[in-house]
Curated annotation (Swiss-Prot):
EC number: 2.4.2.18
Annotated gene: trpD
Organism this protein belongs to: Desulforudis audaxviator (strain MP104C)
Function: Catalyzes the transfer of the phosphoribosyl group of 5-phosphorylribose-1-pyrophosphate (PRPP) to anthranilate to yield N-(5'-phosphoribosyl)-anthranilate (PRA).
Name of the featured protein: Anthranilate phosphoribosyltransferase
Binding site for Mg(2+) 1: 92, 226
Molecular function as annotated in GO: anthranilate phosphoribosyltransferase activity; magnesium ion binding
Claim: Cytoplasm is one of the keywords in the record: no
Pathway: Amino-acid biosynthesis; L-tryptophan biosynthesis; L-tryptophan from chorismate: step 2/5
Catalytic reactions on record: N-(5-phospho-beta-D-ribosyl)anthranilate + diphosphate = 5-phospho-alpha-D-ribose 1-diphosphate + anthranilate
Amino acid sequence: MIREALQKLVGGEDLEQHEAEAVMAEIMDGEATSAQIGALLAGLRLKKETAAEIRGFARAMRARAEQVPTRHELVADTCGTGGDGAQTFNISTTAAFVVAGAGVPVAKHGNTAVSSRCGSADVLRHLGVNLDLTPAQMGACLDEVGIAFLFAPRLHRAMQHAAGPRKELGIRTVFNILGPLTNPVRPRVQVLGVFDAAVAELVADALAGLEVERAFVIHGAGRLDEVSLAGPAQVWEVRPGSVRAGILDPVDLGFERADVESLSGGSPADNARITLEILHGASGPRRDAVLLNAGLALLAAGRAGDAAGAVRLAAESLDSGAARERLTRLIEFTERCKHVEHDNRL
């Protein structure tokens, strides 16, 4: 199938969803050569990916990911694409604890740094979270603690077949936007930040055809893959089979304007400190950004009727200590997993 796909791309034609799914299946199953994979990725980048192609790729990757069992029917994720280059602190990771503290289970899908100095895995490791869990342990953590970190390399082992070509190409490819769409838990609720507005719209269209109940795809002011305080954010509300574009201005929710630099982070140690400060009650633009992004997840989960109410719930999660407690319990649970043999049992 990949040869046929390359012929279409050379001619400037788009792939149908089923064709994209079949091509990604070949890649993930080790049936495509490095040259073919590199040509496909470069061809897609030159042509520009479509929502149908992205959706097809995501479906194939989901099907081949190691599954994470959970008893929760409604699970949220706050994973974004990264790649905005803004070097902010880990906003969506901090927001995940706020969402979990408000009672919505969170399966945080993530990895080490892509374009920043500190990815979600980096900051969590520095906070004391053990990332070396089996899929069964991840699921048990989600059920017991209400939040779990799903370390992408552990769950998407078939990605090894594309690792070499991606590294050799040295350019952004479709894989850079597939991470948030390939969470093995298949969360029904998502807040998904994207580094580019045009790509965000594509991602929203792709997500509408996957298993989602309600999601918000966002592109923040200052070209962030988060809602920022620098200005209005572009927001795409996603429901099954439909996408509605809109604008979210933090000022309308009572927040003060702040420039992107006020959200700056640094090394894993710096970002871990910032996360702890917020969870322990620090005020200011960083807290506000976390409230905004967590509020969107709570709104998508149906915990509030509007954005203002959702932000209030997020503030309660922080101020009551519930968000901080989720981090403490996550650290304790994953520490216990160090002393259990990796045989898919706890």
